[in-house]
Amino acid sequence: MQKYSEMSKEQLQALKKELDQQYAEIKAQGLALDMSRGKPSVDQLNISMDMMDVLSSSTDLRCETGVDCRNYGVMDGIPEAKRLLGEISEVDPEHIIIYGNSSLNVMFDTVSRSMTHGVMGNTPWCKLDKVKFLCPVPGYDRHFKITEFFGIEMINVPMSPEGPDMDMVEKLVSEDPAIKGIWCVPKYSTPQGYTYSEETVKRFARLKPAAPDFRIYWDNAYSVHHLYDDEKEQDFLLEILDECAKAGNPDMVYKFTSTSKISFPGSGIAALAASKANLDDIRKYITVQTIGHDKLNQLRHVKFFKNLDGVHAHMSRHAAILRPKFEMVEATLEKELGGLGIGEWTTPKGGYFISFESMEGCAKKIVAMAKEAGVVMTGAGATYPYGKDPKDSNIRIAPSFPPIDELEKAAKVFVVCVKLASVEKLLAE
């Protein structure tokens, strides 16, 4: 295929006329399709329905230490839930605190606590002149919303298939004590689906921060969320807590996880893994905040999954639903846009997103055109702090939620919008 940039003005005008016609025909269909969030589909939710039958009025609702899970108590999680989430997080159960239904909630609480009370005896952030966070971009919009909410200055750090630009991370963290943290989705990152290389993880562990209360916010949201069952087709991520301990920085990381996209989003269990010193510090606040989280839900999850093998078997069923959707979107992008020079996209082996890079200055227009044609997508710019993509080029594609027939229609609408926006940009130059 001829690249759009190599076409003459006359060729581009003829192509625009053709694309305008296609776009008008799409709009006339009155579509109402949604690719805006990385939500599990109804089919995915259905595979967890047996969990609803695990507990009944005749079930022994005591955990393995004999505590009645119907009552108050066990502030940081029942032992069997710690063991299960520890396996998912690749850490020992003693390094885990079990929370409620949302790891995002745990991250918000962690930042909030740091603002009001500081980290392990250090000055509360609210008493400092300036607090900054590093934000690998493109990244997860809800991370950025947390730091924006607290008035924390966010600094963009470019991503590559190896992870964040570690030269930049090392330099900034070592020179500026106002930098208190970095947001990371280290495995099947949002939205690109990249997994940090072993060297990147080791460089994180060896950081020498100017701030004694600097923390890596390691959001391990997609630790077991592979698209393929063959281990050769799965990404591997080095375990960060272990690496930090080896490097003499045991307290430098908070590792977050949840079962939100394993069982039921919003009704799963979340966990924080960290060093003993960090967990001791955190427990001081949790004992004031709660008498305990939902132990019946913890028990329900343990009885349903039993162990990590049970989780992997369950995730294989998720993958069987997700894989054809990702492959269909990727095939459509390749067939319709390959070789045209108007877009690039990732082909992840796991996670929930495909990252699309349009021609510079086209993302907002593409998303707006798709919406007008009946396809709702994640807002352009959402993958950057403050919603400001400096190149206006990144679009997050979320294939998971729509049925595959609707997704196919949405993908076809998307490529027409990409072509039309690109032609209009070239004609305007």
Task: List the model feature ranges, each with a label.
Residues 220:
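Walker B catalytic acidic pair
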Residues 316-330, 342-357:
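Conserved glycine-rich beta-strand-loop-beta hairpin in the small C-terminal domain of fold type I
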Residues 355-360, 377-417:
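Conserved PLP-binding active-site segment of the aspartate aminotransferase-like
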Residues 366-372, 410-415:
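Short amphipathic alpha-helices in soluble, non-transmembrane regions
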Residues 99, 241-323, 336, 423:
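Conserved core segment of the aminotransferase class I/II
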Residues 67-212, 223-248, 363, 413, ...:
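Conserved core of the PLP fold type I
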Residues 2-76, 81, 86-87, 372-375:
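N-terminal "arm"/small-domain region of PLP-dependent enzymes with the aminotransferase-like
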